[in-house]
Curated annotation (Swiss-Prot):
Annotated catalytic residues: K66 (proton acceptor)
Keyword NADP part of the UniProt annotation: yes
Keywords: Amino-acid biosynthesis, Aromatic amino acid biosynthesis, NADP, Oxidoreductase
GO biological process, one term: aromatic amino acid family biosynthetic process
GO CC list: cytosol
EC number: 1.1.1.25
Record text on subunit structure and interactions: Homodimer.
Source organism per UniProt: Legionella pneumophila subsp. pneumophila (strain Philadelphia 1 / ATCC 33152 / DSM 7513)
Pathway(s) this gene product operates in, as recorded in its UniProt entry: Metabolic intermediate biosynthesis; chorismate biosynthesis; chorismate from D-erythrose 4-phosphate and phosphoenolpyruvate: step 4/7
EC class (word): oxidoreductase
Protein name: Shikimate dehydrogenase (NADP(+))
HAMAP family membership: Shikimate_DH_AroE (MF_00222)
């Protein structure tokens, strides 16, 4: 029986999710269609309701609707609750369920490059993207997890929810780290946060949650210019999609060849 899935967001034309999920479907021999839905700021909640009334099996949610999707759901996973946002929806026993697979997607992609246990990790930015990855990063048992933000107040809001983290402003960064994660939106506008020289002198591994299929993101290029190994978030996109696919279809697809295919576009 043909299963129906979609991703909703605004904008949505650029989304790679249909390509990724169709490749998962071919690999696992599951018949499905996966569409793009342009979100309507006024009618978003009705769009979600209509999708499932029309026998939709699962829905991915992207910017700017993750918080609204979270608020709609009656039942949420623990990681979804801690993230305060949802990117994966499905119906079960006539109730809307929500998950957030971004964090586990990041962890799985990072595992290709380094072990997180006992590492010093710096997250740049204290917005929704940062909040969504803190819990899974803490589960990996790093030595230290620091969130840096332009304004300290916003970072302190995260610290109240996650007391295990330390917070600082960009201006006060002085120490070295094993891993730096850019969770700001600066790369989307081609800008970077210029870090103090001593922060990059230890040559940390650098990861940008943003991605660009055609070229390096601004943060990745900045880190490489500083002599650091750096990658963007395309692998995270594929891994979070795999987790959503597993939630809906109870089959975990493999991701390596799909990631290689997307990189070679």
């Amino acid at each position: 029986m043909l299963r129906r899935f979609a991703v909703i967001g605004h904008p949505i034309a650029h989304s790679l999710s249909p390509v990724i999920h169709q490749m998962f479907a071919q690999q696992t021999q599951i018949e499905l269609i996966y569409e793009k839905i342009l979100g309507d700021d006024v009618k978003f909640e009705q769009q979600i309701s209509d999708f499932f009334i029309q026998y939709g099996n699962g829905l991915n949610v992207t910017l700017p609707y993750k918080k609204r999707a979270y608020e709609l759901a009656k039942i949420r996973t623990q990681r979804c609750t801690l993230a305060g946002a949802a990117n994966t929806l499905w119906m079960e026993e006539n109730q809307l369920h929500a998950d957030n697979t971004d964090g586990i997607g990041l962890i799985r992609d990072l595992s290709r490059f380094l072990e997180l246990k006992d590492k010093k990790i710096l997250i740049l930015g204290a917005g929704g993207a940062a909040r969504g990855i803190i819990f899974p990063l803490l589960e990996a048992k790093p030595l230290q997890l620091i969130v840096a933000n332009r304004t300290l107040e916003k970072a302190e809001e995260l610290q109240r929810q996650f007391p295990q983290i330390n917070v600082t402003s960009f201006a006060e960064l002085t120490e070295f780290f094993d891993l730096i994660i850019n969770a700001t939106s600066t790369s989307l506008s081609g800008q970077v946060i210029v870090l103090p020289e001593e922060v990059l002198s230890h040559k940390p591994f650098c990861y940008d949650l943003a991605y660009n299929q055609k070229t390096s993101t601004a943060f990745v290029q900045y880190a490489r210019n500083g002599g650091c190994e750096a990658v963007d978030g395309l692998g995270m996109l594929v891994e979070q999609a795999a987790e959503a696919f597993f939630t809906w279809n109870k089959v975990m697809p493999s991701t390596q060849k799909i990631l290689e295919h997307l990189r070679s576009f």
